A protein has these predicted regions:
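Bacterial N-terminal signal peptides that target proteins for export
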Residues: 1-9
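Bacterial N-terminal signal peptides
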Residues: 8-18
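Serine-dependent protease modules
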Residues: 22-267
Length: 267
């Protein structure tokens, strides 16, 4: 009889542990993502560049029929070719204050003559650059949304992150705004040679070009990192994504918002 009760007790304990592990793995992120999406934005940066289509006229021997042909061709084509053209860059960002303060990567808006922020509902607003820190690869923007209310994210504590924790990336990869991917934290304090100021969180959540500047969330819906870089031989995601830790970013974001630059101490 004692053995029977003992076996029943063991079965109950194992069942309890199994049930607990099932609860630790969410059935879906859908409810959480629905709440987070309005706080994530797409960013389009427009830079005016010189048109490089004005090739020199090929040289031919004097009297060659090609000489006259190419002179006539280039004379007819060049006037119709504009001297300048817009170049569009795409990235991601997220709202940190419902007054219109937005965080992204510095490289997303570097050299931009015009910055446009596209909200999740597809409404577009011109953005003003409040400040950027190229060394930390962070930038802070400001939009005036008028009467439209904005949803802001909550910062999380990246110091408490452990390898194996869930991570959720939301952004604008390849111009596909509102794309959501999930994975785990693969490593912390990762040095990828991008400078001495930041050690990155590594995640296997799929991150591609255009995700730069977007948020990396924990399972509680808090921003624990800013997606910044990938390592890939193909240019696409192979599960090696890197994010600036939230605790490092928060201090810099505050300074960029208040002063337009980062103040660093020197010895």
């Amino acid at each position: 009889m004692k053995n029977k009760y003992f076996l029943s007790f063991i079965f109950f304990i194992n069942f309890f542990i199994f049930s607990f592990n099932l609860k630790a793995t969410p059935d879906s992120f859908a409810d959480l993502v629905e709440e987070l999406l309005p706080a994530v934005v797409s960013i389009a940066s427009t830079t005016i560049v010189e048109n490089k289509n004005n090739q020199p006229i090929p040289r031919f021997p004097e009297g060659s029929p090609f000489d006259e042909f190419f002179k006539e061709y280039f004379d007819n084509e060049r006037p119709s070719s504009p001297k300048q053209r817009p170049m569009i860059g795409l990235g991601s960002g997220f709202i940190v204050d419902n007054s219109g303060i937005i965080v992204t990567n510095s490289h997303v808006i570097e050299g931009a003559d015009e910055i446009t922020v596209i909200l999740h509902n597809q409404n577009e607003y011109k953005a003003t650059l409040l400040g950027r820190d190229p060394k930390a690869d962070l930038a802070v923007l400001k939009i005036d949304s008028g009467n439209e209310s904005l949803k802001a994210v909550k910062w999380g504590d990246s110091v408490t992150i452990r390898v194996g924790d869930w991570s959720i990336a939301i952004g604008n990869p390849l111009g596909l705004g509102g794309t959501v991917t999930a994975g785990i934290i693969s490593a912390i304090s990762r040095d990828i040679g991008n400078g001495p100021y930041v050690k990155f969180l590594q995640t296997d959540a799929s991150i591609n070009r255009g995700n730069s500047g977007g948020p990396l969330f924990n399972i509680n819906g808090e921003v624990i990192g800013i997606n910044t870089a990938i390592i890939s031989q193909t240019g696409g995601s192979i599960g090696l994504g890197f994010a600036i830790p939230a605790n490092s970013a928060k201090k810099i974001v505050t300074q960029l918002k208040d002063f337009g630059r980062t103040k660093r101490g020197w010895l």
